[in-house]
Regions:
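Conserved class I S-adenosyl-L-methionine
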Residues: 1-51, 64, 68, 150-187
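Class I SAM-dependent methyltransferase SAM/SAH-binding core
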Residues: 54-110
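A short acidic, Gly/Pro-enriched loop at the edge of an enzyme's catalytic core
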Residues: 112-121
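Residues lining the SAM
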Residues: 123-125, 154
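A short glycine-rich, Lys/Arg-flanked "PGG" loop and its adjoining helix->strand segment in the class I
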Residues: 135-150
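Short alpha-helix
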Residues: 189, 200-223
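Core SAM-dependent methyltransferase catalytic element
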Residues: 216-218, 243-265
Length: 265
């Protein structure tokens, strides 16, 4: 199967998720509209002050984080390949009277629709695992950064994607061995939603991610790994005193998230 077909399946999946995600407790749009940020303490502390800065948010879904950046004083642009998600993002920014910009595009094709450079490029929680080619991804990141601009990403650790979450047997390679096809029921935000869909993803090691960025002119400032998740998105998770999640059967033995900060040289 070619890349276009993979993206067609995944775009259909994400289009179908928009309505259930909008109404889910996970996204809690009601409290968001009332002023609550959708960003977590980890990324907020690592990104720092963004007031007055321009931010490009890649793979933004329906843009709650993007709008949160606008509320913090940034000039924020969100990009996603789901037309339905972008439509909802535009609806939210209109309702909330923020100046957030949204673009519907596959990030590999973004140069055809956007001719700007940004102080910050940001991506989070469900990013490179949806992309087959990290060299092209990192080139896009570098292209849209101003010289001296900052790239920041935070995501679920690739070690997690090796395991069968029920049996804890190793099911997939840590390294990119090609597209992984899965039949999914519901989603992380609405596990009881009735839709059944096919998705395609790719495992990428930390070294593959880091080297793709370095090879495209970015200097790594830090790589952090965390023994917790900001979200309850896997089975067998319990919440700790600080509101962070970890696997009940694994404790703090596995890295669940990582973050990277880099600067364009």
């Amino acid at each position: 199967m070619n890349e276009t077909k993979y993206f067609e399946y995944n775009r259909k999946l994400w289009d179908e998720r928009v309505e259930s995600h909008k109404n889910s407790k996970f996204y809690n749009v009601k409290d968001f509209k009332a002023g609550k940020t959708s960003l977590n303490a980890t990324e907020l502390s690592e990104i720092g002050d963004i007031n007055g800065k321009s931010i490009l948010h890649l793979q933004c879904h329906f843009g709650m984080d993007t709008i949160s950046f606008s509320r913090m004083g940034a000039k924020a642009t969100g990009v996603d390949f789901s037309d339905d998600a972008i439509d909802l993002g535009r609806e939210l920014t209109k309702d909330l009277k923020t100046d957030t910009c949204f673009i519907s595009a596959n990030i590999y094709d973004l140069k055809e629709q956007l001719d700007s450079r940004f102080d910050i490029v940001f991506t989070s929680y469900g990013t490179v695992g949806w992309l087959p080619d990290l060299t092209r991804w990192a080139e896009i990141v570098s292209h849209f950064l101003k010289d001296g601009g900052m790239f920041y990403m935070i995501d679920f650790h690739p070690v997690i994607w090796m395991y069968d979450n029920k049996s804890w047997d190793i099911k997939y390679s840590y390294f990119n061995s090609g597209a992984i096809r899965e039949e999914v029921h519901g989603s992380y935000a609405d596990r009881y939603h009735q839709n059944v869909a096919i998705e395609y993803g790719w495992n990428h090691s930390i070294s593959e991610i880091i080297n793709a960025l370095i090879n495209n002119g970015l200097q790594i400032k830090f790589l952090n790994e965390f023994p917790f998740s900001s979200y309850n998105v896997f089975q067998d998770m319990v919440q700790g005193k600080r509101g962070q999640w970890h696997f009940k059967s694994q404790g703090n033995n596995l890295p669940l998230m990582y973050s990277i900060k880099a600067v364009k040289r």
